Amino acid sequence: IGAGVSGLLGFATVASADEAEHGLECPSYPWPHAGILSSYDHASIRRGHQVYQQVCASCHSMSLVSYRDLVGVAYTEEEVKAMAAEIEVEDGPNDEGEMFTRPGKLSDRFPQPYPNEAAARFANGGAYPPDLSLITKARHNGQNYVFALLTAYRDPPAGVSIREGLHYNPYFPGGAIAMPKMLNDGAVEYEDGVPATEAQMGKDVVSFLTWAAEPEMEERKLMGFKWIFVLSLALLQAAYYRRLRWSVLKSRKLVLDVVN
């Protein structure tokens, strides 16, 4: 019995050490766009973009997303043009060979919060905030991981010490993350009046980040459904010809009548 208890304790210790090193396994959440024929919740994408703008964009870039990508997905073209015009973009050179600034336009990418990586690390105590353009594809179990990470901040358990400047999060590898808790109830005021709870903001920003990483998902699913339909018709046609046309030829027998 003693050996069995020791073995269980040893296994528990190894499991705890592995969780501390790699982070807890994320639970699975019922994302509305995860079904085979499901599409994005575009109202959630719009709210998620609002969360990104007001909460995340001060530290995290989305260098692969342009303003025009939002047209028809979460905003009208006029809304996106007005949004892009609020930023200043360095352009040029002009006819005199000098750089100049201009209002943003639809073709511009989302602005960078820092001019370079060194500036980003200096502003964040040595930590480098990752680009969020593909974050839900760049992390294992991406959507579930990002949601769990954003909503799982808590006080460290007894016996666990966190270095100053870091914050305890059981889903982050090592359990200590430089990013503080950012989603607090009421942190943003949604335009559509939906209550901005921590869980709601986490769901919405993950929906937005998932769309940013896979903007073609709806088109891909629709194309897959069309191909399945066409191939099903082709299969039925092939089965018909095999059963009623080819089988006659296949079963036909030739008789050789030899005349003496």
UniProtKB/Swiss-Prot annotation:
Mitochondrial matrix topological domain residue ranges: 242-260
The protein's enzyme class: translocase
Pfam families membership: Cytochrom_C1
Catalysed reactions, semicolon-separated: a quinol + 2 Fe(III)-[cytochrome c](out) = a quinone + 2 Fe(II)-[cytochrome c](out) + 2 H(+)(out)
GO biological process: mitochondrial electron transport, ubiquinol to cytochrome c
GO molecular function: heme binding; metal ion binding; ubiquinol-cytochrome-c reductase activity
Topology of this chain in the membrane: Single-pass membrane protein
SUPFAM superfamilies for the chain: Cytochrome c, Cytochrome c1 subunit of cytochrome bc1 complex (Ubiquinol-cytochrome c reductase), transmembrane anchor
Cofactor(s) the protein needs: heme c
Comment on bound cofactor: Binds 1 heme c group covalently per subunit.
Domain named Cytochrome c: residues: 43-150
Domain of life of the native organism: Eukaryota
Protein localization: Mitochondrion inner membrane
Residues involved in heme c binding: 56, 59-60, 179
Sorted UniProt keywords: Electron transport, Heme, Iron, Membrane, Metal-binding, Mitochondrion, Mitochondrion inner membrane, Respiratory chain, Transit peptide, Translocase, Transmembrane, Transmembrane helix, Transport
Family: Belongs to the cytochrome c family.
Subunit structure: Component of the ubiquinol-cytochrome c oxidoreductase (cytochrome b-c1 complex, complex III, CIII), a multisubunit enzyme composed of 3 respiratory subunits cytochrome b, cytochrome c1 and Rieske protein, 2 core protein subunits, and additional low-molecular weight protein subunits. The complex exists as an obligatory dimer and forms supercomplexes (SCs) in the inner mitochondrial membrane with cytochrome c oxidase (complex IV, CIV).
Function noted in UniProt: Component of the ubiquinol-cytochrome c oxidoreductase, a multisubunit transmembrane complex that is part of the mitochondrial electron transport chain which drives oxidative phosphorylation.
Protein name: Cytochrome c1-2, heme protein, mitochondrial
The gene coding this protein: CYCL
